[in-house]
Amino acid sequence: MKKRQALLIGGRYRRPLAGVSAYIDAWGTFLCSSMGGCWRDDEVWDLSSWTVDDIRAAIKSARDNFYTMVIFAGHGEVRKDQYGFLRTYAWLNDDVAMSEHELNPGSERATLIMDCCRKVQLQLINESMEKYALDELVLNGVDTRKVYENELDMCETGFVKVYAADIGQSATDDESFSRTLIEGLRDAYVHGNMGRVVNIRDAVNLAGRILPPQQTPVYNGGRRLKHYPFAINPLVYE
């Protein structure tokens, strides 16, 4: 069986960052929904309360997965690493930051999403996740998990990265990248503006059209012909 795994990491600080836990919960709900590809509960790990050493071990152990997603929400910054390369760093807590290089699980297919927000207006999006009940009403037996895995099979291997904002930008106070990415896509589905399978590149581009112009999300997928799936539209059949 092809093993997939999602590692969710919410930054934990002495002064908690409003909204982080809600966004991590929302990612879990989205991934396990029909639209998110029907991930199983045991494939989605919330590492937010884990020690830094345990988080590092979990990322390392994901190396042999068929597909891994690492999703971080919290404080972040861009600075040069020891070799002089600009890297985005995720602050796991007030004292420890991990670079995007360290967050790479090394599995043959992997996606890193860094929702590095400095201030977030608290808006518990998990309350709106009731809307995903729509999935179960319209699926009529369509196996979106299988559709998702078929899409992964057709993709080239490699590590892709998604950033909530471009270098020099910060996430806005009024918008959350996670919220925009998930809810914006669902609304586009309902209004018939997207096809059956939406890949990560197109999902990020959609979020970029919704977010204010001061915040430009970035997708770094390298030179690939086919991008990893992000969502399956339960309203479209083939």
Task: Give the label of every model feature segment.
Residues M1-E238:
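Cysteine endopeptidase catalytic domains of the caspase/legumain-like
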